[in-house]
């Protein structure tokens, strides 16, 4: 027998997802959504939804009068599993020390690698669970989590196991990415390490939960050809390619992503309109991470070149993510939406789409409707104490998430009928 899990009704604005044509939001005034057996069963005007799914019959009924209801945020780029504390590096950066100089001195990624290697399995699971808790409280219901702080086969596999263990017990839907090629360990050179990733790490990682293989394609890290080798090998093991590309320099990672038909290319601070066109032609989702530029005091990526390149093409024009990591310590997609509008001058509707439906495409989840509220999609529903989606960027620095439902079950907040 079907179960009416939840009815959220009376929303001043209900955000469904991309409108017909895909380039703007479909919204309803006085909107409602009903969730049955974990999936959206009805969405539309409150009177129509309540006539078919009375609130008094629901396990959870939420009166969203005066509020905005939208799909749960999708965060397509995080390094949420880590150990240790690098807040002292934050202070050094404020004094003007470049991140690459910190990395060269054994800080940055390599410092976190040492902490992760020293952490117990239980500590890794607990650390990730704590990060997911905060993400969920800020409205994220689907999140990618990368490895990459192991840099050896044993620790990378321990990270994969920890991600799987935390994900199995958490309401956030976790998508796992193998990132063995996150940095070059200080006891080897890049070519030798690439061989180790291909020969040792990838065969072991293929037995775990990873869906994607990512590489940090950047000057003084991994070249385009080294990245290609790793991603080709990952694909042979069933892992779809992703890239960190054009973050500090324009090295050619975006074009590589296009050549490979990668699922996404991420960062892209130094990408050009030609790169944007190549990604759009290849159906690669660009993932912009404005919080990283914010904390590093770098110029923001230009979303308009990606939006323009995507015109009249299929696929998501652009996505947004937090890049949650010890160097960019934010869990809030709402904050990222605000940065996208106030820093990168995105329209609020575009920013909300880039944090929901378009972000799902960066995880190859767009086809199943993740990041939308349509009949048959997962019942991941966000209730925000604001009169419209515009207030997400308009009111920065405030977590106005009032309730989060995952598969129709209250995970954060709630309220009465």
Curated annotation (Swiss-Prot):
Gene3D superfamilies associated with the record: Metal-dependent hydrolases, Urease, subunit C, domain 1
Q: Which GO terms describe its molecular function?
A: imidazolonepropionase activity; iron ion binding; zinc ion binding
Tell me which residues bind 4-imidazolone-5-propanoate: 86, 149, 182, 247
- What top-level class of enzyme does the UniProt entry assign? hydrolase
The family database entries (Pfam families) matched by this protein are listed as: Amidohydro_1
For activity, the cofactor(s) needed are: Zn(2+); Fe(3+)
Can you tell me which residues bind Zn(2+)?
A: 77, 79, 244, 323
EC number(s) stated in the UniProt entry for this protein: 3.5.2.7
Which of this chain's residues are annotated to bind N-formimidoyl-L-glutamate? 149, 325
Reactions the enzyme catalyzes: 4-imidazolone-5-propanoate + H2O = N-formimidoyl-L-glutamate
Quick one: which residues bind Fe(3+)? 77, 79, 244, 323
Where is the protein localized? Answer: Cytoplasm
* Annotated GO CC locations: cytoplasm
Describe which pathway this protein belongs to, using the record's wording: Amino-acid degradation; L-histidine degradation into L-glutamate; N-formimidoyl-L-glutamate from L-histidine: step 3/3
Cofactor binding note: Binds 1 zinc or iron ion per subunit.
Keywords, alphabetical:
Cytoplasm, Histidine metabolism, Hydrolase, Iron, Metal-binding, Zinc
Instruction: Tell me the Gene Ontology biological-process terms attached to this UniProt entry.
Output: L-histidine catabolic process; L-histidine catabolic process to glutamate and formamide; L-histidine catabolic process to glutamate and formate
State the superkingdom: Archaea
The entry's function note states: Catalyzes the hydrolytic cleavage of the carbon-nitrogen bond in imidazolone-5-propanoate to yield N-formimidoyl-L-glutamate. It is the third step in the universal histidine degradation pathway.
The family annotation for this protein states:
Belongs to the metallo-dependent hydrolases superfamily. HutI family.
Q: Which HAMAP family match?
A: HutI
Q: What is this protein called?
A: Imidazolonepropionase
UniProt organism field: Halobacterium salinarum (strain ATCC 700922 / JCM 11081 / NRC-1) (Halobacterium halobium)
